[in-house]
Amino acid sequence: MDWTWRILFLVAAATGAHSQVQLVQSGAEVKKPGASVKVSCKASGYTFTGYYMHWVRQAPGQGLEWMGWINPNSGGTNYAQKFQGWVTMTRDTSISTAYMELSRLRSDDTAVYYCAR
C-alpha cells in the first residue's frame, strides 16, 4: 500500500460523516516568513491515546503531503525526512489534544494543514 493512498484514507477517515469521531482544529492563521505556527487538533469520540495522530498538508494546487505522526500514548514521533528538525509534534493527553508546530516558515509553507487519526 503506498503512502498516497494511506494519506487520502486518513483525511477521509478524519472527516467521515457517519463517524462519532471528531477532530477539531484551530483556525486559520497568517504568519510572516521566519515565524513559527502551532496548530492544535482536539479529539473526541474515541480513546485519544489509542491511535496515532498524523499530520498532512496540502499546498494550493498540490497533492497531499504527509508530515509525520505522534503516538499520543507515549509521545513518540516519526517525522517525514523533509520535516525533521523543522516540525515538532506534541500532545496533551489531559485535554485530548495534539499539536503540530512548524518553525522558520517560508512562503511555500502556505497550505491547509490537517490532523488525521
Curated annotation (Swiss-Prot):
Entry GO MF terms: antigen binding
Region (Complementarity-determining-3): 116-117
Region (Complementarity-determining-2): 70-77
UniProt keywords, alphabetically: Adaptive immunity, Cell membrane, Disulfide bond, Immunity, Immunoglobulin, Immunoglobulin domain, Membrane, Pyrrolidone carboxylic acid, Secreted, Signal
Record region (Framework-2): 53-69
GO cellular component labels: extracellular region; immunoglobulin complex; plasma membrane
Signal peptide location: 1-19
Disulphide-bonded residues: C41-C115
CDD domains in UniProt: IgV_H
Physiological role: V region of the variable domain of immunoglobulin heavy chains that participates in the antigen recognition. Immunoglobulins, also known as antibodies, are membrane-bound or secreted glycoproteins produced by B lymphocytes. In the recognition phase of humoral immunity, the membrane-bound immunoglobulins serve as receptors which, upon binding of a specific antigen, trigger the clonal expansion and differentiation of B lymphocytes into immunoglobulins-secreting plasma cells.
Protein name per UniProt: Immunoglobulin heavy variable 1-2
This protein's encoding gene: IGHV1-2
